Amino acid sequence: MKPTILTGDRPTGKLHIGHYIGSLKNRVLLQNEDKYNLFVFLADQQALTDHAKEPEKIIQSVGEVALDYLAVGLDPSKSTIFIQSQIPEIAELSMYYMNLVSLARLERNPTVKSEIAQKGFGE
C-alpha cells in the first residue's frame, strides 16, 4: 500500500512563482514518482475565513488555481484533485472535531492567538 499525501491551497488569488518553487514543483515530482497516493485540494472553505466579505473572489480563484495545477503538470489521472466544499464528509468531520476542542484550548494555539490579535477579535 502506498503512503498518502494530502496537500492543498487556499484559493484567495492567483498562484505565483513562490507557490511553484515552494510546493507545486514538489507535488508534480511526488506524483510522477508513483510511490504515493497524492490528494491535492482547493481549500475554498478555509479561504472564506480571511475573505468572508468577498466570496465571489474565492469562487473565481478556484477555477484559476485548478487551471494552474494542470498547467504546472498535476495530472488528474495520477493525482486526486478536489474542491473542499464539494466533499460533504469534510464538513461532517469538522463538526466532530469542533466538539472535541474547547475554546480555551483553541485560544492557546499560537496561530490562533496571532490571528485573534491581528484581526482585533480580542478587544
What does each of the following model-derived ranges do?
Residues P3-E123:
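N-terminal Rossmann-like or analogous alpha/beta NTP/dinucleotide-binding catalytic cores
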